[in-house]
Amino acid sequence: MRSDVITKGTKSAPQRALLNALGLTKEEIERPLVGIVSSKNDIVPGHMNLDKIVEAVKTGVSMAGGTPIVFPAIAVCDGIAMGHQGMKYSLVTRDLIADSTEAMAMAHAFDALVMVPNCDKNVPGLLMAAARLNIPTIFVSGGPMLAGKVDGCKVSFSSISEAVGAFNGGKITEEKLEEFESKVCPTCGSCSGMYTANSMNCLTEVLGMALGGNGTIPAVYSDRIKLAKHAGMKIMELLERNIRPRDVMTEAAFKNALTMDMALGCSTNSMLHLPAIAHEAGIELNVDMANEISAKTPNLCHLAPAGHNYVEELNEAGGIYAVMNEINKLNLLSTDLITCTGKTVAENIKGCINKNKEVIRPVENPYSTTGGIAILKGNLAPDSCVVKRSAVAPEMLKHEGPARVFDCEEDALNAINTGKIVAGDVVIIRYEGPKGGPGMREMLNPTSAIMGRGLGGSVALITDGRFSGATRGAAIGHVSPEAAVGGNIALVEEGDIIKIDIEANSIDFEISEEELERRRSNWKPRQPKITTGYLARYASMVTSGNRGAILEIPKF
């Protein structure tokens, strides 16, 4: 075992002395050492319950003959970090989480790992670490929050963001805004729609790195505790059989994840995270592949913000395995792949029926015959950009309008809130990319302001930043190359006509080649906004959105 280096032989007496100091018995030291990565903290609603999950995992590991040892991982609440400088620090934590987990696992020679994440960057960061370390690993998340209720209708985090826009537009009272504030987030857990956290927890299940139910069992259900115990027991089987992350997260598994991403209508952030996780597994996952998969994958689920169902309804309808079973009627999944259950995908999903055909549409009656996410290209985004097609109003799938250009989120939000953006406009927010931000902030506040003011069917927003999974509307992000490196988005001027055709996967602005070259010759790179600390290091190493904003090691 890996832990033999710190537990066996006379040479390991100093290490055993320190393990004794932990209160471990001789018998515990001789068992496999299972690291449990706890992301518990008291600032993230989706992580406040993880101590309960961790204790259940520890019980499961002990029941199956292992020695559980807990160590921490950080986690940011994107909702709390939203709309201020804190959002620059969200995406960057994905790599901090991967790096620090690698360091802890290697330094202490764990035999296996159980990852306990829940929210946005925490899940992909730990998946990246798992792929990088390639020691037996299983995931069990904290689970989704239950939806709230206002006026008898279910609501979630996206509802409060749009309520702010409605209040600023004079459409609701301050009292109604306060009601939304007090009711949209009624329990612990990851926010209740198909936002980024739940998207990634569901896709972890699809990849084969978590047991069935991981993405959908609500945080407050006792089944979540049972799932954690089963995960703790299962890791011992994975260790015995030496089933490792790269055995599970194969190229075919990532294609399954992209397919299910389209079927579920996941967050556009998945288009950043899946390539980054694949990269750590030694697999190149080109985002262009998404359109090929989308073209043959029907969108079966419209969970919030795209629709009025929530993850709790998806759980009751049969969960991710039921959606996989439905999609597999079209033979779109590789089902012979091994998973963390010790069984194949086919064995996992066998008999998992669709219990609610309103929540999970049959393949014969999908929301659309193509997937929930689209990759667009054109002279505005030569390398690519991304949009959550399933959350775009039908009338905005094709749009043409004048550019309203802003060089930061704050200026754009002020213009929207003061009525300077009108029907037909295309809001451009640039210098918010991975390097330019730095940190690629989410533009939830501007998109929510657009929706809240009733402009969701007439105004588009384009950015080299990214979006919260709670965003809906014609919100097009991850424009690559970004403005900070001289991408064409930096050359757009106020009033330029922008042409968006989501069904044709195109995005352009009207300009002659001569004028484009003239603007390019006049463009000058901007000085970095931040020159010290982690963000400065991050900006110097990060790649573009179309590559998953991975960090590139400098060549010496």
UniProtKB/Swiss-Prot annotation:
- Details of cofactor binding: Binds 1 [2Fe-2S] cluster per subunit. This cluster acts as a Lewis acid cofactor.
| Any one Gene Ontology cellular component term annotated for this protein | cytosol
Query: What PROSITE patterns does the entry give?
Result: ILVD_EDD_1, ILVD_EDD_2
As one GO molecular function, the record gives: dihydroxy-acid dehydratase activity
Q: Which cofactor does it need?
A: [2Fe-2S] cluster; Mg(2+)
Which GO biological process annotations does it have? isoleucine biosynthetic process; L-valine biosynthetic process
Q: Which UniProt keywords apply?
A: 2Fe-2S, Amino-acid biosynthesis, Branched-chain amino acid biosynthesis, Iron, Iron-sulfur, Lyase, Magnesium, Metal-binding
One Pfam family it belongs to? ILVD_EDD_N
EC no. given is 4.2.1.9
Residues annotated as binding [2Fe-2S] cluster: 119, 191
What InterPro entries does UniProt report for this protein, alphabetically? Dihydro-acid_dehy_C, DihydroxyA_deHydtase, DiOHA_6PGluconate_deHydtase_CS, ILV_EDD_C, ILV_EDD_N, IlvD/EDD_N
List the catalysed reactions. (2R)-2,3-dihydroxy-3-methylbutanoate = 3-methyl-2-oxobutanoate + H2O; (2R,3R)-2,3-dihydroxy-3-methylpentanoate = (S)-3-methyl-2-oxopentanoate + H2O
What binding partners and quaternary form does the record give? Homodimer.
Q: Which family does it belong to?
A: Belongs to the IlvD/Edd family.
Protein purpose = Functions in the biosynthesis of branched-chain amino acids. Catalyzes the dehydration of (2R,3R)-2,3-dihydroxy-3-methylpentanoate (2,3-dihydroxy-3-methylvalerate) into 2-oxo-3-methylpentanoate (2-oxo-3-methylvalerate) and of (2R)-2,3-dihydroxy-3-methylbutanoate (2,3-dihydroxyisovalerate) into 2-oxo-3-methylbutanoate (2-oxoisovalerate), the penultimate precursor to L-isoleucine and L-valine, respectively.
Query: What's the protein name?
Result: Dihydroxy-acid dehydratase
What organism does this protein naturally occur in? Answer: Clostridium kluyveri (strain ATCC 8527 / DSM 555 / NBRC 12016 / NCIMB 10680 / K1)
Q: Which gene encodes it?
A: ilvD
